[in-house]
Amino acid sequence: LMEARRCKKIYLPFFLCDSVTGACERSGAEIEFYHMDEGLHPVLEERTLPEGEYLYLVNYYGQLTDDKIRKYKKIYGNIIVDHTHAFFQKPLPGVDTLYSCRKFLGVSDGAYLSTDAELEPEKKPLDHSMGRMEHILGRYEYDAGTFYQKMLDNAANYHEMEIRRMSRLTGNLLRTMDYSGIKARREQNYR
């Protein structure tokens, strides 16, 4: 996305996953970190960002409603929304939006991107995820604690990994998932 948008500078929150920071560093874009208020909203000067500059917004706990996202889009112009923790919140037209399958659906890799940018995914290498499945599959036969270190090691590897296309294994697993059932269970657990 950063390549397609020709991103020269990105504003990131201090409270952010290393894999995002690593991807931004590898893109060559200048990074400026910003603080957030107690509601996890950016504390930044309100201004339209020039071409090539983007504000990265993370929807940590559903605090970014559609109306708030539209407000940030109107103020800053160039925004990227990270719905890693709000997987079932629909993307808005004209707003680049990321969703992490790995963090939300229990697969070893993969993400969805909603954008109108012209991408060339075929130029990215295909990921192979079989070797990163042990900690996920092991939890079904043993306890999560047994595979905790493997999960941490797996997550650490993403910081240095280049952007790849989703593995065929992950794509096949995601096609078998009952998304409406998962959403209903998540909402029930929230109550």
PLM region spans:
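Short, well-ordered beta-strand core segments
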Residues: 55, 79, 97-98, 111
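Active-site glycine-centered loops adjacent to acidic/histidine catalytic or metal-binding residues
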Residues: 82, 102-103
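PLP-dependent aminotransferase-like
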Residues: 3-78, 86-87
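Short, hinge-like loop/turn segments at secondary-structure boundaries
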Residues: 50, 97-100
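Active-site region of PLP-dependent enzymes
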Residues: 89, 93, 103-191
